């Protein structure tokens, strides 16, 4: 069947810029998927998506005018129900066939097949392929219903009666199959071949689209619009680089993918211009200036070769006037008060020391069940003191940093820009004459804030960051505020991962149980249930992180089953398990370890790992004990020096003695003394085999 190319455009009022990329991709991909499902696209059909502030569009090549007919085999009923004893169709079968548009003449062509229970009648029917107009109508309605729209608007159509719900009011619909207009409608609009270009700079309005393939070129030349989100974004990147080079040889625009996407969603005809502000504003911390330019004005600040902020910035305008000075001047006038506000906040904040603000935290509620920020800081200080003592970090500096960590929450700058919490605390601490290690720790105690974020830059920061995150975890677990499903309002998963990363990447010599013990003391302890839940939560987060790094489920289960306390060793344990699993003895020893564990579980009480050699009677148990006497010290010595691979590989010598033991020795002997001694031998074996990891997890 012949094909043509398809063009669809929905013309709307300005779409949310932050959501435009996602909405545009969803619009194109969902529409394509629906048409594909209906059989209206060729196998090699190519999709081109369009998304600009005022339009969502799709271009598809090789679209069928009608889908191919399909033969569908439909299950009817058991043959015993459909065919009577006389061999003729029963009324029930005839009624079913009539519903499918067939009569008694179709009975002879019915197929009989078993469905595993009985012989069943099947009817082959031909389903006529859907027409493009009908299929596109269905696809468009489905697509609009599935868009990831942040908020929906309700508006009335021109008739004043009908109400429509969509992200923004829609004003036009183009649907072209080749040069033919398709008869579809949606959101109270009927498809045509006219659209509108740039709000201010279109050369022709309306723009009459000749055919599906001319859309992109016509909307660009006649409508002054780059309709493709990707092309418009690339053009902005090109212009930013060009303008930065023009502004100064060593200047580069700040890299911010989210800002770039948002600006791409704001303009249809990008034009990058250079603006500047007074150098006096550079006395303000550059993070403040950068944030106000990006968040409030959507500008791209220019940085020098050392990463320092210059007094120039780039504006992505939506118009291209012959004389851009008015546009530039207007933007410079707008940004100046913003920068002046930032300077005012900075100057005012420095009139009070951070220490003088600490008392004010007693009036800031942290959680109605956990008290104020002041009470929270007291807990963080106590936890930080305990951790600093165990890690040999300057306890006084850790205490000061913990005490001042949240003080900047009461400053004007952080009140205006919450994203600067910690950052401003560092600047104000340095202004107050505090040591750099303390100032850095105040900023860094929030780190790592997200996947890939850097860790605190010094030991004091590491201690306070651990204390802050542990206080949050222990406090919220103590009142039952744990993450459920996708809901994690207090970012506890992120806090747990932050702790894990600091322990592993920082190679901190402290156990996870020691940390929880230190953190629970200011809360007067955790219940056994809450402590166990928190420990499992942390190890679950670690398991997820390790899976993302490519470790197998068996390897992870083997190591984490023991809940190793020093997380800095986890990578070495995993490497040792992987090397052990490659040994020819591994499978047999893993199975044996599993068997030993099952035997010991059935014994009432705890089995002591000790052996009375005088009670060893069978040659196999004597041989196993002798081998254990040699192997166990070797494995323990390697474990003690951190050579986990050698520790596990030493176990290989146990394979034959263990196999012989299970082949020739009755563990549960009738003689109680023999039975207890053999159980003690197995407990000793189990102890030796489960120092680095629970190798039974490697059993098939």
UniProtKB/Swiss-Prot annotation:
- Give the record's family classification: Belongs to the class-II aminoacyl-tRNA synthetase family.
EC annotation? 6.1.1.14
The answer to whether UniProt assigns keyword Nucleotidyltransferase to this entry is no
InterPro entries in alphabetical order: DALR_anticod-bd, Gly-tRNA-synth_bsu, Gly-tRNA-synth_heterodimer
Say which species the protein is native to: Janthinobacterium sp. (strain Marseille)
- The name of this protein is Glycine--tRNA ligase beta subunit
UniProt catalytic activity: tRNA(Gly) + glycine + ATP = glycyl-tRNA(Gly) + AMP + diphosphate
Q: Which GO terms describe its molecular function?
A: arginine-tRNA ligase activity; ATP binding; glycine-tRNA ligase activity
